[in-house]
Regions:
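Cytosolic-side transmembrane-helix boundaries in multi-pass membrane proteins
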Residues: 1-25, 38, 240, 247, ...
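Single transmembrane alpha-helix segments in multi-pass membrane proteins
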Residues: 36-37, 55-111, 124-143, 244, ...
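Transmembrane alpha-helices
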Residues: 214-218, 248-274
């Protein structure tokens, strides 16, 4: 198959993936509207569905800034899950890696008062280490990464809570607010906050920084690594067929560990973007639930079909309807309606292979037949003149 046919096939795959995702979103929104009708038909349209569709634009520019602030870590946790998916692994441990990344970023900011980019590096490093451990067990003991990742989610949560809280005497802990110290309220931490370059004034919020642009840049970088480098080829080869990769001389064990380490690093980086933008402070007393950003990353990756560039748009969409749900009037609807719609969309994404097959059949059926029935080009033959 020549390069032209490969490019054509890749374009068809991209088109069908995008259309399948849009179909999932459309069906999810329709089902969500029907739920709103069932709960309170009188306000289902204006006070319900329209507010969800408007998202942050319902209270612009503040709401839009809130969307961007929440989307940045979603892009990163989505990349974390998608990167592992591409290499044949299921990184359900993004929540734990995100937790360790949050601790690394906040420790460097509060205790060491380091610049924001150093704090981000610390978050990335700790997340990567936490991700590499399940990768090690998978590579050398063939222990399912899903099981070890889930266990390390909870280990990471309780470890970080104890390191921060320390029976209420931890130096990072604010007893009055029962959270870590607020970075924006202490000038000593100013250098640890990600710069906003005027975005805070534009969106009238103190948590909108360049984090979303950093996340988008990382997504593009991951796409390049996976599709344009030998390292990315080796990772995907191990994911597609370990035996064939081993036969080709690729170090299977090394690539499994590196894949999970990089997935963890991406999740940790996302936590750094979130907490160093001062969107929230860590609450060590919340010991019963893991950070939702880690699990929402699974939703982002599924909606994007594990495409690194697609995670940017799917994260923005998930953030959009989540913020829209927060603007619902609690007199008529619970704010969890947006989570319900997200859940329906993600559930439908599980059937995306079926949707892609149907869409491909409808759009490219005739084109495929033309390619199959086309006669191959005649081979060039050289004739030798016989000398007398």
């Amino acid at each position: 198959m020549d390069k032209k046919k490969l490019s054509h096939s890749s374009l068809q795959s991209s088109v069908t993936s995008v259309l399948a995702a849009l179909l999932c979103i459309l069906i999810g929104l329709i089902v969500g509207f029907l739920v709103l009708l069932a709960i309170n038909p009188a306000h289902a349209w204006g006070d319900g569905f329209v507010r969800i569709l408007k998202g942050g634009f319902h209270d612009a520019p503040y709401g839009v800034g809130k969307e961007l602030a929440n989307a940045a870590p979603l892009v990163m946790t989505g990349l974390s899950v998608a990167f592992a998916f591409k290499t044949g692994l299921f990184n359900i441990g993004a929540a734990g890696q995100y937790t360790l990344g949050a601790y690394g970023a906040l420790y460097c900011a509060i205790m060491l008062k380091m610049p924001w980019f150093v704090c981000l590096l610390a978050a990335t490093l700790l997340g990567g280490i936490w991700g590499a451990i399940p990768g090690f067990f998978k590579a050398y003991f063939n222990i399912n990464e899903v099981i070890t990742s889930i266990m390390f989610n909870w280990i990471g949560l309780y470890l970080v809570n104890e390191l921060v809280y320390q029976n209420g005497t931890g130096p990072m802990y604010d007893v009055r607010n029962t959270r870590t110290l607020n970075l924006s309220k202490n000038p000593a931490f100013a250098q640890s906050i990600i710069p906003d370059f005027g975005l805070n004034k534009m969106f009238q919020t103190n948590s909108t920084t360049i984090a979303i642009f950093l996340a988008a840049a990382v997504a593009i970088l991951i796409w390049v690594v996976l599709n344009k480098t030998t390292f990315g080829y080796e990772l995907k080869a191990v994911g597609l067929n370990k035996s064939a990769a081993r036969y080709a001389g690729i170090n299977e064990k090394k690539n499994i560990i590196l894949s999970m380490a990089r997935a963890g690093a991406l999740a940790g980086f996302g936590a750094g973007l979130y907490y160093l933008s001062n969107v929230a402070q860590w609450n060590p007393l919340n010991s019963t639930s893991l950070p939702t950003m880690g699990f929402n990353g699974i939703s982002v990756a599924l909606l994007a079909s594990s495409n690194p560039i697609g995670t940017i748009f799917s994260a923005l969409f998930i953030s959009h309807i989540s913020v829209g749900g927060s603007f619902l009037s609690t007199k008529y609807y619970p704010t969890e309606i947006s989570d319900l719609i997200s859940g329906i969309i993600i559930y439908l994404c599980a059937f995306s292979m079926l949707f892609r097959g149907k869409i491909h059949g409808l759009l490219f059926k005739n084109a495929d037949k033309t390619n199959v029935n086309a006669e191959p080009a005649p081979a060039k033959t050289e004739t030798k003149k016989e000398g007398k």
